[in-house]
A protein has these predicted regions:
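Extended, non-globular alpha-helical segments
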Residues: 1-2
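Glycine/small-residue-rich phosphate/adenosyl-binding loop
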Residues: 79-94
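A glycine-centered beta-loop-beta connector
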Residues: 31, 38-61, 122, 130-147
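A short, polar/charged loop-to-alpha-helix boundary motif
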Residues: 61-78, 148-158
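Extracellular/periplasmic ligand-binding regions of membrane signal-transduction receptors
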Residues: 13
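The conserved cystathionine-beta-synthase
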Residues: 18-41, 47, 66, 90, ...
């Protein structure tokens, strides 16, 4: 009988972190670097001041914030130049804190749990990134949608 895979069998151990009180400008730079090179992750693991897991910040979180600003700019009555209002608001994003925009607050999975459980959570919640934590709530890895696809696709298509 084949042993079930655990999260620590498939998780990516090379991942980037950022403090919850960091500014989004710093987070954007880190995410951009992540996307361009290893670990090629769509986000960052967010840490509280004690170094414990606090959440994740993903490209989707940035896009949701931009969409919110876009709607606010378009809704301003009497504004013919919504684009100017939009970019004025965008300049303020950089000073926001990561904790104001991050998602996945406290949503994580344990390193010894079945990978199948992670797959279900990622697929059900439509997550891009799931943090893997140890018994002390310290992040030890990540599982991405891409990793789920890499692990499941061969079973489906071979």
């Amino acid at each position: 009988m084949q042993r079930k895979m655990a999260n620590n069998d498939v998780m990516t151990r090379n991942f980037s972190t950022i403090k919850a009180d960091a500014h989004l400008k710093e987070a954007y730079d880190a995410i951009k670097k992540n996307l361009e090179g290893p670990p090629h992750a769509p986000g960052l693991v967010v840490l509280d001041n004690a170094g414990k897991y606090a959440g994740v910040l993903t490209v989707d979180d940035f896009m949701k914030e931009l969409a919110r600003l876009y709607r606010a700019a378009c809704d301003q009555l009497g504004k013919k130049e919504w684009i100017a209002a939009f970019f004025n608001q965008c300049e303020l994003i950089g000073i926001k804190k990561v904790s104001e925009v991050m998602s996945g607050k406290r949503l994580s999975i344990r390193e010894g749990d079945d990978f199948e459980k992670s797959c279900k959570l990622i697929l059900k919640k439509k997550l891009n990134l799931l943090a893997v934590v140890n018994e002390n709530a310290e992040p030890v890895g990540i599982i991405t949608r891409r990793k789920v696809l890499e692990e499941i696709a061969p079973r489906i298509f071979t």
